[in-house]
Curated annotation (Swiss-Prot):
GO molecular function, one term: structural constituent of ribosome
One GO cellular component term noted in the UniProt record for this chain: cytosolic large ribosomal subunit
Matches recorded under Pfam families: Ribosomal_L39
Family per record: Belongs to the eukaryotic ribosomal protein eL39 family.
Assembly notes: Interacts with impact.
InterPro entries named in the record: Ribosomal_eL39, Ribosomal_eL39_CS, Ribosomal_eL39_dom_sf
Protein name: Large ribosomal subunit protein eL39
Keywords: Ribonucleoprotein, Ribosomal protein
Amino acid sequence: MASHKTFRIKRFLAKKQKQNRPIPQWIRMKTGNKIRYNSKRRHWRRTKLGL
């Protein structure tokens, strides 16, 4: 990744960084909840973004 990024790339990376987090614990406590964990987590070394 270049140190000089375009704003579009930077915005894309920021969105991916925000998506890559666990689900809050209070969501698991909701009644009838089936979500155990965030299945769309991405590890920086295992799966690349395809940039």
